[in-house]
Structure formats: C-alpha cells, structure tokens
C-alpha cells in the first residue's frame, strides 16, 4: 500500500487543480456567464488564452474599480493589445511590448500579467523578478526548453507563441520594466478543510456560488473579488486555500530540506526567499504557479540553464510535498 501511495504521488500526471485546463464551452454555460456579466460580476474572459465568446463582452456600460477615475467597457478590458491601465499613476511609463505588443502576433505583456506585473494564478507574477531571469525564460520558451507538463493548458502555450514572436527589444524592454519595481503582497493564504466549490473558467478557479466541498490535498486559488479580477484590476488579489498543517510542513522542508528529501531553498533563493542575483524570489508568489514549476522541473519539461540544480532539488518530492512548500512560500511577505 505504501508503494501504491508513493507511486500515486510521483505520478507523471499533472495535478488538475494546479494545471487549470478550460473545459469545452457549452451554450448553457455561456448564457449563464453572460447573465453574470450583466449582473456586474463579470466572470468572462478576453481575447487571449482561454477566451470566451464575444457575446459576453457586449455590455456597453462603463465599468470602474476602486481608487481610480478611469472608466472602461468590458470589451475594452479584453483587448489583448491594449490592456486596461486602471492606475496609471502607480507604475513607470510602459514600453510598447507591455502596453500594446504588436498586432497580430504579439500580445501585450500587460494583458495577461497585468500592467503592474502582479500576474494571476494561471501565469507568472513578473513584478520584481530579475531582468536576466525574465530574458532567460523567454529564450527558453522560444527554444523549447520550457514547456508545460500539461500541454492543454492555454497560458504556457501562449507564452511559447509570444516568445517566438518577440524580438530582442520587446523582451529586454519588458524585462527592464517589470524588474524596476517591487512585487506587492497579492495572495492571502488560508489553511482550510473545506473550500467554496469552483469551476475552471479562463484558466483559473472561479466560485460557483453553490456551497462548499472538501479541499483534500489540493491548493485552490481564486480571486478575492471576481468582478475586479475579470476587469484586470491590478489592485485586487487572490486567496489560496491550502490543507491544514501544510504551512508548517512546508516550512520544515524549505528550511531544512526534510532530511535529504530536498535542499534548503534559501541556499539559492536567498534569505527570506526574496531572490538572489538572477535566481527568482519565491516569497508571497502564487502557490499554484510554484507547484506547476516544481512539477514541470521534476518531469523534465522545464530544462533551461540552472534547471539541473532545481531538478535535483525536486526529484524526490511528492505532490503533497510540493503543496506544502508552495503553501509556505506563498505565506511569506514578499
């Protein structure tokens, strides 16, 4: 039985709660989402990865979010070549690659990752990452050294397309921009036995408003405010529900290596997990994203420079270990 349990945890099948694959659209679901949009809880998607039918964006009423005088329609917030900038006074001037991209082949970086680089669970938070690290990841996406263990997941495939379409100036200017300002606290980590029921829409978990369910050995990360998230408000973050006891378990693994199961993360990721040179920070970042990266590295689908070091650090980890590590790192202050 122990062997069976270990084999299950070491399975090559990616955990579906972390690799959020959009289900096939249905007319009934589209109609329900359109009604929700009209009610002001826009849970639809945009013209990028995981796009929804255009009908859901047809509401012409101006929308706004707290702390801004900007008003935009839902359709405007879903323009992959002109992402909404609700708080233009809170970031430096954007380079073209972040603000607009290049039609038709290169989406604006600020569309998926938000103009302030805070990102979403289905992609990376770019704010505060080392410029050299961002540049290397784009090279890895372009060369095929960085892929996803779940080939059906939209955002990694979009990154491969965008990396191939981007030129050196696009990449270096975006990297310099996102690395020039800090990442802010974005994820509230909560240990829980039960969580709101969710479904996958637009490559992320969204609540169904239909009661609760056991969390089990998963991380469920969802918007704090669905409407603001779908309007791409870079001031509205996420809540991540993690198993009870996972933060303490993760702390032990992160700080000690768990008696040889892994290595102390601070060795490479720096004191307080805030990064070290070109090595990225982990503190406060999306736990869903962190699990995906550990799993991808363990499976060998992410294999750029320095990946061999990380492969050695994750090759003995079970998915439960990854959950614990990600719960702990996400709970730390950025």
Question: What are these model-derived regions, one by one?
Answer:
Residues 257, 264, 272-278, 286-291, ...:
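Intrinsically disordered, low-complexity segments enriched in Gly and acidic/Ser/Thr residues
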Residues 115, 271:
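Cys/His-rich metal-chelating microdomains
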Residues 120-126, 277-283:
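Short cysteine/histidine-rich zinc-coordinating motifs and their immediately flanking basic loops
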Residues 4-9:
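Sec/Tat signal peptide C-region and signal peptidase I cleavage site
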Residues 130-142, 286-298:
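Short microdomains enriched in Cys/His and/or Lys/Arg
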Residues 111, 267:
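Short, cysteine/histidine-rich loop/knuckle motifs that typically chelate Zn2+
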Residues 10-107, 146-264, 299-334:
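Flexible coil segments in periplasmic/lumen-exposed cytochrome c-class electron-transfer proteins
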């Amino acid at each position: 039985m122990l062997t069976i349990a270990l084999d299950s945890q070491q399975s090559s099948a990616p955990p579906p709660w972390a690799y959020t694959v959009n289900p096939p659209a249905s007319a009934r679901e589209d109609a329900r989402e359109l009604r929700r949009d009209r009610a002001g809880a826009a849970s639809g998607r945009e013209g990028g990865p995981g796009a929804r039918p255009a009908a859901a964006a047809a509401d012409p009423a101006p929308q706004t979010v707290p702390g801004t005088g900007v008003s935009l329609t839902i359709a405007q917030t879903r323009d992959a070549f002109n992402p909404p900038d609700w708080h233009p006074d809170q970031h430096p001037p954007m380079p073209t690659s972040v603000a607009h991209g290049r039609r038709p082949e290169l989406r604006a970086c600020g569309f998926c990752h938000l103009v302030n680089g805070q990102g979403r669970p289905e992609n990376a938070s770019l704010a505060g990452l080392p410029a050299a690290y961002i540049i290397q990841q784009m090279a890895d996406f372009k060369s095929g050294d960085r892929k996803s263990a779940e080939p059906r997941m939209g955002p990694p495939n979009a990154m491969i397309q965008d990396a191939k379409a981007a030129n050196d100036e696009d990449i270096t200017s975006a990297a310099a921009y996102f690395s020039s300002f800090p990442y802010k606290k974005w994820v509230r980590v909560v240990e829980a036995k039960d969580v709101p029921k969710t479904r996958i829409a637009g490559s992320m978990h969204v609540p169904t408003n239909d009661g609760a369910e056991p969390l089990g050995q998963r991380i469920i990360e969802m918007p704090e405010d669905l409407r603001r998230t779908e309007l791409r408000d870079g001031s509205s973050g996420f809540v991540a529900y993690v198993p009870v006891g996972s933060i303490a378990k993760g702390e032990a693994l992160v700080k000690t290596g768990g008696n040889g199961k892994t290595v102390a993360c601070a060795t490479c990721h720096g004191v307080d997990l805030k990064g070290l040179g070109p090595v990225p920070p982990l503190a406060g970042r999306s736990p869903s994203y962190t699990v995906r990266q550990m799993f991808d590295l363990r499976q060998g689908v992410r294999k750029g420079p320095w990946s061999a070091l990380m492969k050695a650090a994750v090759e003995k980890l079970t998915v439960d270990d990854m959950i614990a590590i990600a719960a702990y790192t996400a709970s730390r202050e950025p």
